[in-house]
Amino acid sequence: MGLSDQEWQQVLSIWGKVESDLAGHGHQVLMRLFQDHPETLDRFDKFKGLKTPDQMKGSEDLKKHGVTVLTQLGKILKQKGNHESELKPLAQTHATKHKIPVKYLEFISEAIMKVIAEKHAADFGGDSQAAMKKALELFRNDMASKYKEFGFQG
């Protein structure tokens, strides 16, 4: 299920816009994740107290974690599918330490898609959306495979 060169170009083009404001995008992605799927908060001890949108908006820790999430994802996307060295340590911590279910990776992928669509509607048309969706699916599938290697069924 690899992406074509053109699809990777679309993914990395829109990702450049995300990287221009990692803090803003990351913060919004996590807020969207926690608001749309409140059960995901249970996996984040330091964010469990954030129950309202205002609390989430004011959280510097949430903003910092958003930068971390999108920075790691960006490193993986830039490898254009050849991401074994970047993916393995991420999968290991998410499988063995954080125990993040694959379903939650789907949820954050949805949040990423929504935030990009809201912030960059003019640059995130159907082809770009399809390419990004495919890239995020590749990421999730490869994470799920690694989870199994680490004995986590997620």
Curated annotation (Swiss-Prot):
PANTHER family in UniProt = MYOGLOBIN
**Which residues does O2 bind?**
65
Which organism encodes this protein?
Answer: Aethia pygmaea (Whiskered auklet)
Catalytic reactions on record: Fe(III)-heme b-[protein] + nitric oxide + H2O = Fe(II)-heme b-[protein] + nitrite + 2 H(+); H2O2 + AH2 = A + 2 H2O
Q: List the GO cellular component terms.
A: extracellular exosome; sarcoplasm
What is its subcellular localisation?
A: Cytoplasm, Sarcoplasm
Which family, according to the similarity comment?
A: Belongs to the globin family.
Name which cysteines form disulfide bonds: none
Q: Where does nitrite bind?
A: 65
Globin domain sequence ranges: 2-148
Major localization class: cytoplasm
- Name recorded for this polypeptide: Myoglobin
The uppermost taxa in this organism's lineage are: Eukaryota, Metazoa, Chordata, Craniata, Vertebrata
Alphabetical keyword list: Cytoplasm, Heme, Iron, Metal-binding, Muscle protein, Oxidoreductase, Oxygen transport, Transport
- Give a GO molecular function annotation for the protein: metal ion binding
Q: What class of enzyme is it?
A: oxidoreductase
Task: Identify the PROSITE patterns for this entry.
Answer: GLOBIN
Which terms does the UniProt entry file under GO BP? Answer: removal of superoxide radicals
The cross-references to InterPro entries, in alphabetical order and at most eight, read: Globin (IPR000971), Globin-like_sf (IPR009050), Myoglobin (IPR002335)
